[in-house]
Amino acid sequence: MDDKVTNILLSGVGGQGAILASNILAHVFVEAGYDVKKSEVHGMAQRGGDVTTHFRYGKKVYSPLIKYGDVHFLLAFELLEAYRYINYCRNDAKIVINDQKILPPAVNLGQMKYPENIPGTFRKFFDGRVHVIKGQEMALKLGNAQAANVVLVGAFSNFFPEIKDAKWKSALKDLLPQKIHELNFKAFDEGKKAFQE
């Protein structure tokens, strides 16, 4: 293990399960022997406000906050929330974006326009390192839209081949009620597969 600290930013909208996803990551990376620090910033999370988690891991991490322009990995649960943090990403950043639009109140009130073709904008700057996943759609096919966050975690896990699937599934087992284990194992597998297609 070298001294490098890796920075992951998770961004989403309240109710999408972004915080649970960051807890899954924390569980996995601690189990893999890393020091982990994370910091959550909630807008009006319960009302569909933004939710952002700064997540850092390495041999020794001193601060949970990621500097502007220093994100190695972005996991975005909603298109506009991805766009909001595009400038936080390093030039070599790797990105997973959920292909879902949740219109903020300002758009609904006609005060702002929702940006067009957000995935295209990301591809222009991070060519070949942007993976757009239909997390919501895939979770619905499995029978529960709430599993979209685990679909995205499954896709995101592809960036860390050194961490075996068993570790990710162990985190799901420890953090989720038993009655939804099987659903979430399937959601994880589907996300992992969708990333590779």
Predicted regions and their residues:
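Active-site cofactor/cluster-binding pocket
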Residues: M1-E197
